[in-house]
Amino acid sequence: SVMSASPGPDLAGRGYSEHEYAASGIARRFVETPDGGLDGVDTAPFTTRILVRRPDAAQFNGHVLVEWFNVSSGADSAPEYTYVAEELIRSGTAYVGISAQYTGVAGGRDSVDLETTGAGTAGVQGDSLEGKDPERYAGMQHPGDAYSYDMFGSIITALRNTTGEPSPLA
């Protein structure tokens, strides 16, 4: 699951399905060159989670909104989806959320210093995928945030691929 500011619409009741997939590949880590460009200095394997919410094929308008999950709380959250869910469903747009950052996958310190003892926040801080369900997410492998940009881009490229491997959007 993904944290949200509101419970969101009834996906099944509106002709949508929600599925999780593991996305794997090789990501590059970039450093800035003296002339302001980027240089891919090394690579590392990754396996992360993507969350796909899609309409029935007859409703699909061909558009996909992709969101980089926010991890400021120490867990994946989908702030953009919270605000646009109704419009996505109305228009027949698919949604893909990507666990792009290390904290969301493997855990770490939150950046907003949430209290974990207050009402409504218990269990929020540090609820990474591996922390929530170690068995389910045992195959996740995140090389670190320096690789996140290429992971995100690689997953989007794979989603756009209409040949070869089956797409989670199909």
Language-model regions: role of each:
Residues 1-82, 89:
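Catalytic-loop region of hydrolases
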Residues 9, 50, 137, 169-170:
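Generic preference for hydrophobic/aromatic residues in regular secondary structure cores
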Residues 63, 94-95:
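Structural motif
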Residues 71-73, 89, 95-169:
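Cap/lid segment of the alpha/beta-hydrolase catalytic domain
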Residues 79, 83, 147-150:
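A general alpha-helical scaffold signature found inside nucleotide-binding enzyme cores
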